[in-house]
Protein backbone atom coordinates (compact mmCIF):
# COMPACT_ATOMS: atom_id res chain seq x y z
CA UNK A 1 0.00 0.00 0.00
CA UNK A 2 1.14 3.53 -0.76
CA UNK A 3 0.10 6.31 1.62
CA UNK A 4 0.44 9.74 0.02
CA UNK A 5 0.21 12.51 2.62
CA UNK A 6 -0.65 15.80 0.94
CA UNK A 7 -1.23 19.09 2.72
CA UNK A 8 -0.03 22.63 3.11
CA UNK A 9 3.54 23.44 3.92
CA UNK A 10 3.87 23.30 7.70
CA UNK A 11 0.89 21.01 8.28
CA UNK A 12 3.16 18.24 9.56
CA UNK A 13 3.33 15.74 6.69
CA UNK A 14 6.83 14.53 7.49
CA UNK A 15 6.19 14.36 11.23
CA UNK A 16 2.98 12.40 10.67
CA UNK A 17 4.79 10.12 8.19
CA UNK A 18 7.43 9.36 10.81
CA UNK A 19 4.72 8.60 13.39
CA UNK A 20 2.86 6.44 10.85
CA UNK A 21 5.89 4.41 9.76
CA UNK A 22 6.08 2.05 12.79
CA UNK A 23 2.33 1.40 12.64
CA UNK A 24 2.49 -0.07 9.13
CA UNK A 25 3.99 -3.21 7.63
CA UNK A 26 7.74 -2.66 7.11
CA UNK A 27 7.02 0.91 6.00
CA UNK A 28 9.50 2.98 4.00
CA UNK A 29 9.29 6.79 3.77
CA UNK A 30 9.77 7.92 0.17
CA UNK A 31 10.82 11.57 -0.19
CA UNK A 32 10.01 13.18 -3.57
CA UNK A 33 11.82 16.36 -2.46
CA UNK A 34 15.15 14.57 -2.81
CA UNK A 35 14.36 13.92 -6.45
CA UNK A 36 13.22 17.50 -6.96
CA UNK A 37 16.35 18.93 -5.39
CA UNK A 38 18.51 16.70 -7.57
CA UNK A 39 16.73 17.79 -10.73
CA UNK A 40 16.71 21.47 -9.84
CA UNK A 41 20.34 21.46 -8.68
CA UNK A 42 21.48 19.99 -11.98
CA UNK A 43 19.53 22.29 -14.30
CA UNK A 44 20.93 25.65 -15.39
CA UNK A 45 19.30 28.74 -13.88
CA UNK A 46 17.26 29.50 -17.00
CA UNK A 47 15.41 26.18 -16.58
CA UNK A 48 14.63 26.76 -12.88
CA UNK A 49 10.94 26.39 -11.92
CA UNK A 50 9.14 27.58 -8.81
CA UNK A 51 7.85 24.15 -7.78
CA UNK A 52 9.05 20.64 -8.47
CA UNK A 53 5.65 19.89 -10.01
CA UNK A 54 6.59 22.10 -12.95
CA UNK A 55 9.37 19.70 -13.97
CA UNK A 56 7.94 16.91 -16.15
CA UNK A 57 10.98 14.83 -15.21
CA UNK A 58 10.06 15.13 -11.50
CA UNK A 59 6.54 13.86 -12.17
CA UNK A 60 7.74 10.95 -14.31
CA UNK A 61 10.59 9.99 -11.98
CA UNK A 62 8.34 9.89 -8.92
CA UNK A 63 5.76 7.81 -10.77
CA UNK A 64 8.39 5.32 -11.96
CA UNK A 65 10.19 5.06 -8.63
CA UNK A 66 6.96 4.54 -6.70
CA UNK A 67 5.82 1.90 -9.19
CA UNK A 68 9.18 0.14 -8.94
CA UNK A 69 9.20 0.31 -5.14
CA UNK A 70 5.67 -1.04 -4.94
CA UNK A 71 6.53 -3.96 -7.23
CA UNK A 72 9.82 -4.83 -5.52
CA UNK A 73 9.54 -3.76 -1.88
CA UNK A 74 7.93 -5.97 0.76
CA UNK A 75 6.20 -3.28 2.76
CA UNK A 76 4.15 -0.12 2.76
CA UNK A 77 5.37 3.17 1.28
CA UNK A 78 4.65 6.55 2.88
CA UNK A 79 5.01 9.69 0.75
CA UNK A 80 4.85 13.05 2.56
CA UNK A 81 4.64 15.61 -0.26
CA UNK A 82 2.58 18.67 -1.10
CA UNK A 83 0.92 18.62 -4.51
CA UNK A 84 -0.59 21.92 -5.64
CA UNK A 85 -1.50 21.05 -9.23
CA UNK A 86 -4.30 18.79 -10.42
CA UNK A 87 -2.03 17.65 -13.23
CA UNK A 88 0.44 16.28 -10.70
CA UNK A 89 -2.25 14.08 -9.19
CA UNK A 90 -3.02 12.71 -12.66
CA UNK A 91 0.65 12.27 -13.60
CA UNK A 92 1.61 10.31 -10.49
CA UNK A 93 -1.24 9.14 -8.30
CA UNK A 94 -3.94 8.45 -10.88
CA UNK A 95 -1.45 6.56 -13.06
CA UNK A 96 -0.50 4.35 -10.11
CA UNK A 97 -4.16 3.76 -9.26
CA UNK A 98 -4.94 2.96 -12.91
CA UNK A 99 -2.26 0.25 -12.75
CA UNK A 100 -3.99 -1.33 -9.78
CA UNK A 101 -1.53 -0.10 -7.16
CA UNK A 102 -3.41 0.37 -3.88
CA UNK A 103 -3.14 3.83 -2.40
CA UNK A 104 -4.55 5.91 0.41
CA UNK A 105 -4.38 9.54 -0.69
CA UNK A 106 -4.74 11.68 2.42
CA UNK A 107 -4.96 15.46 2.71
CA UNK A 108 -3.93 16.80 6.11
CA UNK A 109 -6.15 19.82 6.74
CA UNK A 110 -5.37 22.91 8.82
CA UNK A 111 -6.42 26.55 8.84
CA UNK A 112 -4.16 29.49 8.00
CA UNK A 113 -3.62 30.54 11.62
CA UNK A 114 -2.53 27.03 12.60
CA UNK A 115 -0.14 26.77 9.66
CA UNK A 116 1.44 30.14 10.41
CA UNK A 117 1.77 29.22 14.07
CA UNK A 118 3.47 25.93 13.20
CA UNK A 119 5.90 27.59 10.83
CA UNK A 120 6.55 31.11 12.09
CA UNK A 121 5.97 30.92 15.84
CA UNK A 122 8.04 27.75 16.06
CA UNK A 123 10.92 29.58 14.38
CA UNK A 124 11.08 27.17 11.43
CA UNK A 125 10.15 29.80 8.83
CA UNK A 126 10.35 33.57 8.45
CA UNK A 127 7.06 35.45 7.83
CA UNK A 128 8.12 36.19 4.22
CA UNK A 129 9.43 32.69 3.42
CA UNK A 130 8.43 30.79 0.30
CA UNK A 131 6.38 28.30 2.33
CA UNK A 132 4.45 30.98 4.21
CA UNK A 133 3.76 32.91 0.98
CA UNK A 134 2.26 29.75 -0.53
CA UNK A 135 -0.21 29.06 2.30
CA UNK A 136 -3.13 30.58 0.30
CA UNK A 137 -2.42 28.29 -2.67
CA UNK A 138 -2.28 25.28 -0.35
CA UNK A 139 -5.57 26.22 1.30
CA UNK A 140 -7.20 26.56 -2.13
CA UNK A 141 -6.12 23.00 -2.94
CA UNK A 142 -7.29 21.81 0.48
CA UNK A 143 -10.84 23.01 -0.16
CA UNK A 144 -10.89 21.82 -3.79
CA UNK A 145 -9.19 18.42 -3.50
CA UNK A 146 -12.00 15.91 -3.99
CA UNK A 147 -9.70 12.92 -4.55
CA UNK A 148 -8.39 12.84 -1.00
CA UNK A 149 -9.45 11.51 2.35
CA UNK A 150 -9.34 14.69 4.46
CA UNK A 151 -8.07 14.55 8.03
CA UNK A 152 -8.22 17.58 10.31
CA UNK A 153 -4.91 18.17 12.09
CA UNK A 154 -5.83 21.19 14.21
CA UNK A 155 -5.22 20.55 17.90
CA UNK A 156 -4.09 16.97 17.30
CA UNK A 157 -0.79 15.20 17.84
CA UNK A 158 1.09 13.51 15.00
CA UNK A 159 0.57 10.19 16.80
CA UNK A 160 -3.21 10.68 16.90
CA UNK A 161 -3.32 11.65 13.22
CA UNK A 162 -1.12 8.72 12.22
CA UNK A 163 -3.37 6.29 14.10
CA UNK A 164 -6.35 7.57 12.13
CA UNK A 165 -4.45 7.06 8.87
CA UNK A 166 -3.30 3.57 9.86
CA UNK A 167 -6.92 2.66 10.62
CA UNK A 168 -7.91 3.46 7.01
CA UNK A 169 -6.57 0.10 5.81
Show where each model-derived region lies:
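Conserved phosphate-donor/acceptor-positioning beta-strand/loop module used by diverse small-molecule
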Residues: 99-119
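P-loop (Walker A) phosphate-binding loop of NTP-binding proteins
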Residues: 8
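Small-molecule kinase domains that catalyze NTP-dependent phosphoryl transfer to phosphate-bearing small molecules
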Residues: 121-164
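Glycine-rich phosphate-binding loop used to anchor ATP phosphates in small-molecule kinases
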Residues: 54-103
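ATP-binding Walker
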Residues: 11
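Hydrophobic anchor at the beta1->P-loop junction of P-loop NTPases
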Residues: 5
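Conserved substrate/cofactor phosphate-moiety recognition/catalytic segment
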Residues: 17-64
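Walker A/P-loop
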Residues: 14
Amino acid sequence: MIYWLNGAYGVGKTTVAEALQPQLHNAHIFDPELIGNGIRDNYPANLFRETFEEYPLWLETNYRLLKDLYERYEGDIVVPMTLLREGSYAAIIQRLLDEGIPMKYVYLDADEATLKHRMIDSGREEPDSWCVRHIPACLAVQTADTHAIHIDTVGRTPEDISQEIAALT
